[in-house]
Amino acid sequence: LGEVDIKGIDATGSLSLQPWDKIRINLSGNYTYQRALDVTPPDPNTYESTYKHQIAYTPRVSASGQAGIETAWIDLSYSFLFSGKRYALGQNIAENRLDSYSDHSISANRDFQIRKITTSFSVEVLNLMDKNYEIVKYFPMPGRSVRATIKIRY
């Protein structure tokens, strides 16, 4: 891999609303389309060429989105990540293809103030749909997991 030609588009948006006095809704998302091709001149002595193939681990399409609700009592959020199919090596052949994947996660966060000590408690559910997927070939990502965090600030 020596030269790469990348063309594409990124679109990002966000919106924050406060429909009621103590409730805020935050929405955001982004979309990427990129055509990232290996344009290194092919070596005539090499049988296998990657010329004009999408470069490894670079999906043509990816997207993410977030939605959150902030209240005086608790903050809730949802996030979504999508990555289109991509290839583990420079040759865009079936053996190197990695399927597209999506990941959904949710979280809840609550802050407490006791005298001069602020405590935050959060719970997250990662990979909510418990989908099996690989970001890197032969290295599967964990299934559904729950993470709880307590932070104390004084």
Task: Describe the function of each predicted region.
Residues 4, 22, 58-60, 99-101, ...:
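Short coil/turn motifs at beta-sheet boundaries
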Residues 1-87, 129:
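Gram-negative outer-membrane beta-barrel transporters
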Residues 73, 103-105, 118:
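Active-site lining segments that contact anionic ligands and/or coordinate catalytic metals
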Residues 7-13, 61-65, 102-108, 144-150:
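Hydrophobic, lipid-facing positions within transmembrane beta-strands of outer-membrane proteins
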Residues 1-2, 50-56, 93-97, 135-139:
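Outer-membrane beta-barrel domain signature
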Residues 35-37, 91, 137:
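Generic alpha-helical secondary structure signal
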Residues 81-89, 97-99, 108-154:
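C-terminal beta-signal and adjacent terminal beta-strands/loops
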